Amino acid sequence: MSFVIASPEALLAAATDLAAIRSTIRAANAAAAVPTTGALAPAADEVSAGIAALFGAQAQSYQAVSAQAAAFHDRFVQLLNAGGGSYASAEIANAQQNLLNAVNAPTQTLLGRPLVGDGADGASGPVGQPGGDGGILWGNGGNGGDSTSPGVAGGAGGSAGLIGNGGRGGNGAPGGAGGNGGLGGLLLGNGGAGGVGGTGDNGVGDLGAGGGGGDGGLGGRAGLIGHGGAGGNGGDGGHGGSGKAGGSGGSGGFGQFGGAGGLLYGNGGAAGSGGNGGDAGTGVSSDGFAGLGGSGGRGGDAGLIGVGGGGGNGGDPGLGARLFQVGSRGGDGGVGGWLYGDGGGGGDGGNGGLPFIGSTNAGNGGSARLIGNGGAGGSGGSGAPGSVSSGGVGGAGNPGGSGGNGGVWYGNGGAGGAAGQGGPGMNTTSPGGPGGVGGHGGTAILFGDGGAGGAGAAGGPGTPDGAAGPGGSGGTGGLLFGVPGPSGPDG
């Protein structure tokens, strides 16, 4: 076969020559326009006048055709210039790629990893593939692939080398955990976010229990400078078949185990929230148990300078019979930076509580270290509605989470979280559940004010209504300077 070689220099030179020819032709046409279009009749007779008019009309037609030819000439010159530029750009790109391949060849051969470049994304499928690692010197990690086969976790995100961001973890298949986020660059880069856990399968037939939701993936840790990746959310539990239990929700990814901020600077990653429990199936003689909600993950800690990540929220239990229909716990906030940074806020607790005593399910605010304010406590979940298993009494509201402590040198304590409301009675003759107690305010150490106490919650409606919960106590002020925090209002 024949080969064609395009030289960008030759194309650009031809375009320049054509432009010069165009200028010469235009000058000649302009010079000929006046004498040809304005030719005078040599005599006053009709024949002379007709000949002059014929020559003038022909000259005008020539000028019109010349204008069209000039426009075509201009377009042709533009196309030649564009073609030459395109060929030149392609040659530069090929040269860069060849240079990049030559640079990456030694490390790719010895270490199985390029020196410069982004990692490839993992393929999605029955088993999600992990993302490729970024270049040793520079490059982002590839994202993990999503899984589709039941119970299989998503692919992990690829890690960066010296500079770059970690890849996102893939989402889990039904009932499978989310993939972990990739690590950020050792020098600079953010950690990748964890993947989302898959939803549990619903029960099949009369005897099928709902499947549990998958746990969320862990957020990726940053290196020296960068923010930690967020943890993935847990999947919801599946619904139970007739008379069978619903699946429990998956837990949120823990930012603490991978979502920490950079050692020098960076915020901790936010934790994922827990999934909701699946609903119980309804049977002829008895109902199944509802699934529990998943716990929220803990926020990631900051390094030297940075803010702690927020805790994830707890999931709610599913609908259906359960003697202890307890809401899942929210995650604690991450700790602030060693030198400077506020603590992260605690996650909210899931709804649901014991008939008479609420479970402590709100996340606590993260504390500061040297300088910084403590994080606010999470809100407590509401009590569960009354049921036959609880004697018709509504569940107690959950207490609010405690605020984090201020920094050792300076910082205010975090505010306590608000309590959850008591659950309503099963019917108009059943008592409502008591309201929860507000969370305690965080303590200041040397300089700073104590955190305000969280608000107490109202009791649930019923006959009689549930007792209101008291507000949380305020935190202690600093030893050298500061005032105590105010107590929270009663419900």
Curated annotation (Swiss-Prot):
Disulfide bonding pattern of the chain: none
A Pfam family annotated for this UniProt entry: PE
Region (Disordered): 114-156, 376-400, 419-491
Chain intervals with Gly residues compositional bias: 128-145, 432-480
Domain PE: 1-92
InterPro entries: PE-PGRS_N (IPR000084), PGRS_rpt (IPR048996)
Family, as annotated: Belongs to the mycobacterial PE family. PGRS subfamily.
Protein name, UniProt field: Uncharacterized PE-PGRS family protein PE_PGRS36
Species this protein is from: Mycobacterium tuberculosis (strain CDC 1551 / Oshkosh)
Lineage: Bacteria, Bacillati, Actinomycetota, Actinomycetes, Mycobacteriales
